[in-house]
Amino acid sequence: MEDDTKIGLDDAYSLKTPADNVALYRNWAETYDTEFARDRGYQYPQQIADIYSRYAGAHDVPVLDVGSGTGLVASTMREHHAIDSQLTIDGVDISPEMLEVSKKKNLYRQLFERDLSQSIELPKNHYGAVVSAGTFTHGHVGPEALAKLLPLCRSSALFIIGINGTAFDQYHFGSHLAALQADRQITPIEFVRVTYYASADDDNGADQGFAAIFRKASLYTPDP
């Protein structure tokens, strides 16, 4: 019998405000890795980490994991770079409870509780890469946050940004990314399709998205 009290995607996709996000993940944090990620075969974070491993060079550190949650992206990154002492990852998330779960895993150098819909108070010109899975989606973070991440990064920083497939069109991610490229803030964008789940058989089981891969332009000079 279906457990009607179990938190799921319908709850996550119906969120309206940052406060809604905080409330949902307060109640979901302790069971997220098992009742959601494990039971659904949630492979999206691993795919984002795999793409980072394929595209990143030695200079693409430290890494900022945006919407880091319980640390699923960082966990796979650590597996790929088990002997790489240079891999430094910071995490940022709106949920203190999710951050507390990830803190226990010892994956991150630092963890920051931040609302990405507001000004992002983090070190400027610091990061060599940004990764994200499950954050740019329905009820969570829109494309406006992308421009806010650029000042946090050094020139030529690598971005691996996962974006929900239907949210991509609904919230006009394509036009926002195109505007950043036209303004010479980012390099041309490559899109790689990602499949979210390996073992989910409900209405969202076949959900897909895109990983947007680009770099912060090395010589960004705004038009006069």
Whereabouts are the PLM-identified features?
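A short glycine-rich, Lys/Arg-flanked "PGG" loop and its adjoining helix->strand segment in the class I
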Residues: 144-155
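Conserved class I S-adenosyl-L-methionine
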Residues: 160-185, 189
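Class I SAM-dependent methyltransferase SAM/SAH-binding core
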Residues: 64-120
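Conserved SAM-binding loop and adjacent beta-strand
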Residues: 34-49
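A short SAM/SAH-binding and catalytic strip from SAM-dependent methyltransferases
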Residues: 128-142
